[in-house]
Amino acid sequence: VLFGDYQICFQTYADLYTVKPDSGKIARAREVMEYQMSTDKDDYWWWADGLYMVMPVMTKMYKLTGNPLYLEKLHEYWTYANSIMYDAEEGLYYRDGKYIYPKHKSVNGKKDFWARGDGWVLAAWQRY
């Protein structure tokens, strides 16, 4: 459950909660995200689309609960993700922490970025 592919649905539950508040709508999101935040790990977001999937969950849950830990951990996870995927020279993100240059190269030996993933990273900032 501590994986963006499973957590992305929490965005919808948070949105539904704002339409008609009912603690049951966000109970599982709160349980999972607060458990995740209680661990010492900061490497949950190691792939570009994970940022799109979970960053908005963190901001939405902060808005609904007022718990500042959501924003603190968002910053911690974002810092980790940037450290392994962001190429400051190009201003772009690699697909994930395993596809970084020079470990992974394009067929012509150059840096290999993933346009869709970079789009998701930018969209993540717009979803909250």
Give each language-model segment a name.
Residues 1-128:
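Glycan-recognition and catalytic cores of secretory/periplasmic carbohydrate-active enzymes
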